[in-house]
Amino acid sequence: MPQTTMVSYLIMALLYIIPILIAVAFLTLVERKILSYMQSRKGPNIVGPFGLLQPIADGIKLFIKEPIRPSTSSPLLFIMMPMLALLLALTAWVPLPLPFSLVDLNLGVLFMVAMSS
C-alpha cells in the first residue's frame, strides 16, 4: 500500500512540474519574439510554424552539447548545482492551492515568500 501512495505522489508531482516547465519554455519563446520585434528582427522562426518548435530545438541542443568542465572544479558540485537550482525554483510552486495539492501548508504564503527570496 505505501508503494501505491508513493507512486501517486510521484505522478502528482510530475503533473505539476511538466506543465510549469512547458510554460516556461514557451514564455521564453514569447520573450524572444517580443525582443526581436523591438529590435526590428524576425526572431526565432526557423523551427516549425512561427517558431513554435523552437523551445524543443533549444532543449535538444542543450542535451547534445558537450559538457565542458573546468579542470579545478569539483565534478559532483558541477553536476549537482544546476539540478539544485531547478529544484529550488520548482519548490516555490508546491504550496499553491490547486484541487489536488501536494502539501497542505498552514503558512503557505510565508513558505512562498521564503522560497522566492
From Swiss-Prot:
Transmembrane segments: 10-30, 76-96, 97-117
Membrane topology, record value: Multi-pass membrane protein
Swiss-Prot/TrEMBL catalytic activity: a ubiquinone + NADH + 5 H(+)(in) = a ubiquinol + NAD(+) + 4 H(+)(out)
Any one cellular-component term (Gene Ontology): mitochondrial inner membrane
EC nos: 7.1.1.2
General function of this protein: Core subunit of the mitochondrial membrane respiratory chain NADH dehydrogenase (Complex I) that is believed to belong to the minimal assembly required for catalysis. Complex I functions in the transfer of electrons from NADH to the respiratory chain. The immediate electron acceptor for the enzyme is believed to be ubiquinone.
Protein's recorded name: NADH-ubiquinone oxidoreductase chain 1
